[in-house]
């Protein structure tokens, strides 16, 4: 039973690490056209600042 719980714990940790890395890759890059992306969300304007799309409402 101990071996099974260690395996489940390792699988859980790996899935969390993979999820965090995938999310950071998506958020680290600006959208191709940040202004249009923000306007589609209802903002007045948008700019790429420090590799993040910043929307101004």
From Swiss-Prot:
Cite a single GO MF annotation: potassium channel regulator activity
Q: Which domain of life is it from?
A: Eukaryota
Localization in the cell: Secreted
Cysteine disulfide links: 30-48, 34-53, 38-55
Example GO CC term: the record gives:
extracellular region
Residue ranges annotated as propeptide are 16-24
Q: In chain numbering, where does the site feature Basic residue of the functional dyad fall?
A: 47
Q: In which tissues is it expressed?
A: Expressed by the venom gland.
**What residue range is the signal peptide?**
1-15
Q: Which InterPro entries match?
A: Scorpion_toxin-like_sf (IPR036574)
Q: Site Aromatic residue of the functional dyad: give positions.
A: 56
Q: Where does it primarily localize?
A: secreted
For this UniProt record, the keywords arranged alphabetically read as follows:
Disulfide bond, Ion channel impairing toxin, Neurotoxin, Potassium channel impairing toxin, Secreted, Signal, Toxin
User: What is the stated purpose of this protein?
Assistant: Recombinant toxin that reversibly inhibits the potassium current of mKv1.3/KCNA3 channel stably expressed in COS7 cells (IC(50)=150 nM).
Q: Which family does it belong to?
A: Belongs to the short scorpion toxin superfamily. Potassium channel inhibitor family. Alpha-KTx 26 subfamily.
Q: What domain comment accompanies this record?
A: Has the structural arrangement of an alpha-helix connected to antiparallel beta-sheets by disulfide bonds (CS-alpha/beta).
Please state what the protein is called. Potassium channel toxin alpha-KTx 26.3
**Originating organism:** Mesobuthus gibbosus
């Amino acid at each position: 039973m101990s071996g099974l719980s260690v395996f489940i714990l390792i699988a859980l940790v790996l899935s969390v690490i993979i999820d965090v890395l995938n999310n950071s890759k998506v958020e680290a890059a600006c959208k191709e056209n940040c202004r249009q992306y923000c306007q589609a969300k209802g903002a007045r304007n948008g700019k790429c600042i420090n590799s993040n799309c910043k929307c101004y409402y």
